Swiss-Prot record:
Catalyzes the attachment of the second N-acetyl-N-hydroxylysine to the carboxylic group of N-citryl-N-acetyl-N-hydroxylysine to yield aerobactin. Involved in the biosynthesis of the siderophore aerobactin which is a chelator that mediates the high-affinity iron transport systems induced under iron-stressed conditions. Keywords: ATP-binding, Ligase, Nucleotide-binding, Transferase. Its EC number is 6.3.2.39. It comes from Vibrio mimicus. It catalyses: N(2)-citryl-N(6)-acetyl-N(6)-hydroxy-L-lysine + N(6)-acetyl-N(6)-hydroxy-L-lysine + ATP = aerobactin + AMP + diphosphate + H(+). It holds the Pfam family IucA_IucC. InterPro entries: Aerobactin_biosyn_IucA/IucC_N, IucA/IucC-like_C, LucA/IucC-like. This is Aerobactin synthase. Belongs to the IucA/IucC family. GO terms for molecular function: aerobactin synthase activity; ATP binding; transferase activity. It comes from the Bacteria. Pathway: Siderophore biosynthesis; aerobactin biosynthesis.
Length: 591
């Protein structure tokens, strides 16, 4: 706690300035309010007589990028106070129509995020952008800021300060597996425990002391009984499973086995862990009943069970499609997965969704297992990060590569955007390519290829039946969301352009390559791909990335309106506004 206090004492004011700037900028982008231009920059006038003034520049997305150090607050009645994120939220509460009970919950997320921000800034004191850029991927992401769009991106509601020190990515604390076995008998009706898996030559953990559990994989069939080894974070056992699965524990269906095996490090997503004992071993993705950003971080059973089949199919696509082979893109497969529902909650379909997502496990190939000689992996999110002095990591990669900015970015767009767009146009499949889902493989510090992952809920299919999907198993089609062409295109536009490139292009602009140049280059690479594959022209027209107006997707305001604790489903984003397409604006700027 002493270190936490030191971080708060040193960085509290700076963290609040940055948070206020992000709140004002993102909320205005989501159309919560509009700024008024002034001679010095911009101002926001609120109904309570309060005025926020600041300097900033409007980017190509129509969003004002605010200088946090320039923000001042002026009140009609009370004396001016230091810049405070909590105070800003109180000023905005009437405008956001947020009742006190909801406000209190989000205030908890705000305070936890500010604490996390202060600790990160303290941790980043001793590291430069150059040093951070060269760290291994698993260690590097423990320095990252988190979700770029959600203003309260380290809420982790449910964790206390001790939990943060043990489980938060920025704590960079490794831990052992925590395991249990779940036993169920087959019955004629669908069982509450299901598994999907295939045997592997290596067990995913070190042998346990008991010889019975030397091989810990799934499924292991014993007559009419199936025994599945589950992994989970110790917090999940202590705070959820040991209480909510008490019936299964009492009847010896669920048996706690304790901590053992390899050491794992939490990734930026909290619920995915990397094997640091054997980096080429499997990552594991686990349900975690902690509220962070938009939802509780459980995993729906239907997605867990469909994941291995979906990843098999996507992998076959990438191994057989000539363009994807040429791009050397690969899939991080999910060779096995398991899910167990608690018997009583399974009978309550309208219960809050977090009670249906308590116990499961997904084994996923690690990025390290796919790398060739001379390659290294980073998350796409790394390109959005800067050090404490504001030096972007992307600048370090470009400089180390010896390439021009334009050449480096051309390689980036060819390696990342083209495979995702090709997958959509040729197969009617979208994968949400946000900064955590895209693993970028570098060679000589330049973009070379991508590794794709996450097929539980972040994969969608076009509404109409495409013949290219004929070989996709019905079990996957049944649980996968389908969207018409004019909506599914926004998985690329919003999932990648808005959520990732929107935060990279301003950093590149600082390096002398303007945002119009950035998006014009992206458009040029897309047009080059389209010109080389005219056989897909009808699909290109259906999935048109160059329409003048595109959907504006809002997350923060939607979260404030959603009753997460009581809801049987996750929040849905706002999709009721349009914005000018940067790809089109960049072409107009050229003219």
């Amino acid at each position: 706690m002493v270190m936490d206090q030191l971080a708060l004492h040193r960085y509290w004011a700076v963290a609040n300035q940055k948070m206020v700037g992000k709140i004002l900028s993102e909320f205005a982008y989501e159309q919560a309010f509009q700024f008024e231009p002034t001679a010095q920059g911009y101002q926001l006038n609120l109904e309570n007589g309060t005025r926020y003034c600041f300097a900033g520049e409007e980017n190509i997305w129509g969003q004002v990028m605010i200088d946090p150090t320039s923000i001042t607050r002026h009140a009609e009645i009370e004396a001016d106070e230091p810049i405070s994120a909590a105070l800003l939220m109180r000023d905005l509460q009437p405008l956001l129509k947020m009742p006190d009970d909801a406000f209190a919950e989000h205030l908890e997320d705000l305070n936890a995020t500010l604490l996390g921000d202060c600790k990160l800034m303290q941790r980043n004191e001793a590291i430069t952008a150059r040093d951070l850029a060269m760290l291994p991927c698993e260690q590097q992401q423990t320095y990252f800021d988190g979700h770029p769009k959600f203003v309260f991106n380290k809420g982790r509601r449910g964790w206390g300060s001790d939990d943060l020190k043990r489980y938060a990515p920025e704590a960079e604390r490794v831990s052992n597996w925590v395991g249990s076995r779940f036993i169920t008998r087959f019955c004629s009706s669908p069982p509450t425990m299901k598994s999907h898996g295939k045997p592997c030559c290596k067990a995913p953990s070190r042998p346990m002391k008991s010889s019975r559990w030397t091989v810990c994989w799934l499924p292991i069939s014993l007559d009419s009984t199936i025994i599945v080894m589950f992994r989970f974070i110790l917090w999940q056992w202590s705070n959820k499973l040991a209480l909510l699965f008490v019936r299964e524990i009492a009847t010896k269906q669920l048996v706690y086995l304790g901590e053992f095996g390899d050491h794992f490090l939490p990734q930026l997503s909290l619920r995915t862990l990397s094997n640091v004992t054997r980096p080429a071993g499997y990552d594991i993705k686990l349900p975690l009943t902690v509220m962070n950003t938009s939802c509780y971080r459980g995993i729906p059973g239907r997605y867990i069970l469909a994941g291995p089949t979906a990843s098999d199919w996507i992998d076959q696509v990438f191994k057989s499609d000539p363009l994807l082979i040429a791009k050397q893109a690969e899939v991080l497969q999910e060779p096995a997965a398991a899910f167990a529902a608690q018997a009583d909650y399974a009978l309550l379909p309208n219960a809050p969704y977090r009670y249906h997502e308590l116990l499961g496990v997904i084994w996923r190939e690690s990025a390290a297992s796919k790398l060739k000689a001379g390659e290294r992996a980073i998350l796409m999110a790394a390109l959005m990060e800067s050090d404490n002095q504001g030096q972007p990591l992307i600048a370090e990669y470009v400089q180390a590569s010896g390439l021009t900015l334009e050449a480096w970015l051309s390689k980036l767009f060819d390696a990342v955007v083209i495979p995702y767009y090709h997958l959509l146009c040729n197969y009617g499949v979208s994968l949400i390519a946000h900064g955590q889902n895209v693993t970028l493989v570098l060679e000589n510090h330049a973009p070379k290829r991508i590794l794709l992952k996450d097929f539980q809920g972040d994969m969608r299919l076009v509404s109409r039946e495409y013949p290219e999907q004929a070989s996709l198993d019905d079990s996957v089609k049944k649980v996968t969301v389908r969207l018409p062409e004019h909506l599914i295109i926004h998985d690329l536009q919003t999932g990648h352009f808005v959520t990732t490139l929107r935060f990279i292009s301003p950093l590149v602009a600082k390096l002398g390559f303007s945002e119009p140049q950035f998006y014009r280059l992206l458009g040029d690479r897309l047009k080059a791909y389209m010109a080389a594959h005219r056989e897909y022209q009808p699909r290109f027209e259906q999935f048109d990335l160059f329409k003048p107006r595109i959907l504006r997707i809002g997350l923060n305001l939607a979260k404030f309106r959603h009753s997460t604790d009581a809801s049987a489903s996750r929040m849905l984003p706002d999709m009721d506004d349009m914005l000018n397409n940067p790809l089109t604006k960049a072409l107009e700027h050229q003219g």
